[in-house]
Amino acid sequence: MKIAVVVFPGSNCDVDLYEALHSVCHADVEYVSHRQKSLAGFDAVMLPGGFSYGDYLRAGAIARFTNIMPAIIKMANEGKPVFGTCNGFQILTEAGLLPGGLKRNDSQRFVCKTVPLEVVNSHTLFTSHYQDHERIALPIAHADGSYYADEKTLDELEANNQVVFRYATENPNGSLHNIAGITNKHGNVLGMMPHPERAVETILGSTDGLRLFESLLENGRIKVEA
């Protein structure tokens, strides 16, 4: 299984994501520039956190129009795994690969801390190594992390089990329904504001993010080999 980590101007978590996959999980992973137009040969793609294009207009709004995005959308439509954390999540919503959007935190401040999460759906490509309703702790670091969608969309997300992670004991940004991460209807696209790549080794304070990558690698290999 070969994974692409896309690098946009202003990405600053691409190295974290790459090292979590390469150094900790020993996965086959490569950096891919936003200028490229093809993801041929890759089985999954990941969009890192950061401040693509300085978050001008809206977080992720400009990155959505880069050369690489049609290839990412193509992979998503083919059912291949697509993952976005923080700014990556924002880009996925701007591209229409995930419903809703991310707006400024209710506090109007940048929030950087580790928060407790509930695993709401462990039956996805990305969460099979977790248990439903399990409590985990992952870091967040964002100013525009408040998830918003209209009531119809929220009802559909809940009915289709598309809410994967929820803020457990406190809502750090004002996200509706305490949503921290969602998938598309097919379950192959996941976006989340917390940073699992920052919680893959004990020295980092938590390994709760490691199982997300282990889930993806195990399920992705099964799909590729099939």
Curated annotation (Swiss-Prot):
GO cellular component: cytoplasm
InterPro entries, alphabetized: Class_I_gatase-like (IPR029062), PRibForGlyAmidine_synth_PurQ (IPR010075)
Entry's EC annotation: 6.3.5.3, 3.5.1.2
Pathway as given in its UniProt record: Purine metabolism; IMP biosynthesis via de novo pathway; 5-amino-1-(5-phospho-D-ribosyl)imidazole from N(2)-formyl-N(1)-(5-phospho-D-ribosyl)glycinamide: step 1/2
Keywords: ATP-binding, Cytoplasm, Glutamine amidotransferase, Hydrolase, Ligase, Nucleotide-binding, Purine biosynthesis
Entry-linked SMART domains: GATase_5 (SM01211)
Keyword Translocase: no
Any one Gene Ontology molecular-function term assigned to this protein's record: ATP binding
Principal localisation: cytoplasm
Subcellular location: Cytoplasm
Biological process terms in GO annotation: 'de novo' IMP biosynthetic process
PROSITE patterns in the record: GATASE_TYPE_1 (PS51273)
Alphabetical list of Gene3D superfamilies matching this protein: 3.40.50.880
Active site positions: C86, H195, E197
Ranges of residues in domain Glutamine amidotransferase type-1: 2-226
PANTHER family: PHOSPHORIBOSYLFORMYLGLYCINAMIDINE SYNTHASE SUBUNIT PURQ (PTHR47552:SF1)
Family annotation (NCBIfam families): FGAM_synth_I, PRK03619.1
Function: Part of the phosphoribosylformylglycinamidine synthase complex involved in the purines biosynthetic pathway. Catalyzes the ATP-dependent conversion of formylglycinamide ribonucleotide (FGAR) and glutamine to yield formylglycinamidine ribonucleotide (FGAM) and glutamate. The FGAM synthase complex is composed of three subunits. PurQ produces an ammonia molecule by converting glutamine to glutamate. PurL transfers the ammonia molecule to FGAR to form FGAM in an ATP-dependent manner.
Protein name: Phosphoribosylformylglycinamidine synthase subunit PurQ
Organism expressing this protein natively: Limosilactobacillus reuteri (strain DSM 20016)
